[in-house]
Amino acid sequence: MVIAFVGWLISVRKVSSATISQYLSGLRMVHLKRGMMPRNLRPDLVKTILKGHSNVDTQSKAPRLAMTFSVMKLLKNLLTSSNFCLEKKRLIWLVSCLAFHGSFRIHELLSRNELSYDSTTTLLGMDIRLVKTKISGVNEEFLIVHLKSPKEDSLKQGVNIEVFSTGTLTCPVQAWHKWLKVRKSTPDPTKPVFRQKDGKCMTGSSFNKDLKGLLGQHIDYDHHKFLSHSFRAGYASMMAAAGYPDAIIMRQGRWHSEAFKAYCKTGRGSRLKEQRDLARKLALHCDKSS
């Protein structure tokens, strides 16, 4: 029975070996909660099947590449020349700039479903705001993105991420202004902030599909691909290539809860200078290497 279930998951559902293992663990837990001792759900034959399926997954899966400034420029040009409506063009670009400079996981920004959402985890209109203030005597603008359910275990009370203007092509604050201008209204505080013109939520899946449709004109996705996580990985990779120490890279990307605590201890003025200098240095590094 277990072998038939595993075979169905592989041949019909097309799920990975890791996902099948999670399903088997969940199945075992259901039995235990109902007071039943489950039989061995991973006999030697199942283990062999899963190992073989894992090897196939590894061989067939195209490697995911880290985003770079050069590819961001290409994405911008492709969006400009695409057949998308102007609002969608600017929405995709805004999400790209935020994911890139804020090192966000894509579902920290986007909903998982087009027609439904969980208000306790999804980024709503009330969870992102533009702040104008003086920092070191200079008028500045930045976005505060409130994550209600961050991945880091010890930060379940929610965290505020500040994303500053960079003065570069990929400036997230400028992208925010341009999106609002074409949208002609502020996001509904009680609904997902990033919704398309038809009212449907932009999802991580639809965002990846749009990325592939655009970048796939120049990149063979059968051999390597850019997906939503490429933005988060890209900033870290470029920081490493530019010589930034591991501690700053970890802090910028909130790679674990201790890194975020270090982020919080850094003053706002210091974070602004650090993010802006970082963006300009990496953009310059990209121009020199291209």
Language-model features and meaning:
Residues 1-290:
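Extended, non-catalytic subsegments within catalytic or DNA/protein-binding/adaptor domains
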